[in-house]
């Protein structure tokens, strides 16, 4: 399962992860087939308009994704 597929499970959640779903869905460049958390985190790091709080949400979602894959 790609990270994109995983994060869609939080669709309609009234949580920061639900907000992340919306943000990712609106990003036409998001690597939808990517499965490696390092590559996903690198994708977010290269964006200049990401604040620290948002990046922490991304890291939390990647941690949950890694737990699922284990």
What do the predicted segments below correspond to?
Residues 11-15, 28-33, 48-49, 66:
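Short alpha-helix boundary/capping elements
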Residues 36-67:
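Short, charge-rich amphipathic interface segments used for partner binding and complex assembly
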Residues 23-31, 40-45:
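Amphipathic alpha-helical segments that form the core helices of the histone-fold
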Residues 1, 67-70:
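Short intrinsically disordered terminal tails
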